[in-house]
Amino acid sequence: FYRYMTEGKSASMEAPLRAVYPRVDSELLTTLKEKRIGYYTTYYNSNNRNRSHNIDLAVKALNNRYVFPGESFSFNQTLGERTAGKGYRRAKVIVRGEVAEGIGGGICQVSSTLFNAVDRAGLTIVQRYSHSRNVPYVPPGRDATVSWYGPDFVFNNPYDHPVLIRAFSGGGQTTILIYSAEEIHNRPREVPSASKKLPAEVPADRNVNQIVP
């Protein structure tokens, strides 16, 4: 480079080659689907198109995510900011204990489903916050509220094997499953199941700025 700049002559140089391997290959993928260590299902009104759409987007962002030993998983960092530009729609959310409408309504049902699946799998909960009022899709105290500029849901993998998140939605239900290798010695926890009974829809105030879905 120096000769080229000072003398106008071309020069050649050899760059060392270093192999870069993916963290996840087909062999690891097969291994991690051997044992289900956690799962949870919640239910929602599929006739609420906007909320269902938001749930679908969040579920797709979570599906097939890996968390390696000692790693922490952040719900907010995985999904990113929920904006209209990313396809999220206005739907009912909880704001300071009241029902309102905002972009990304329904996302907290996904984070709450993930929390219960993760807790059942015996993973370490690092950060979790509850809504300011009970939500209908999980038992009291079993929710995990999230907001881009506010609460996050974070967990850590304390095991000596990676874990795989599988997430699905459709037909009015959201299911999240946690898988790992057959050799994993996990410590599962008892977690109460969600009710299949759906609440009645309620009117919402659209003039709200700070939202927590």
Model-identified regions with their sequence ranges:
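Well-ordered beta-sheet/strand-loop patches within structured domains
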Residues: 2-213
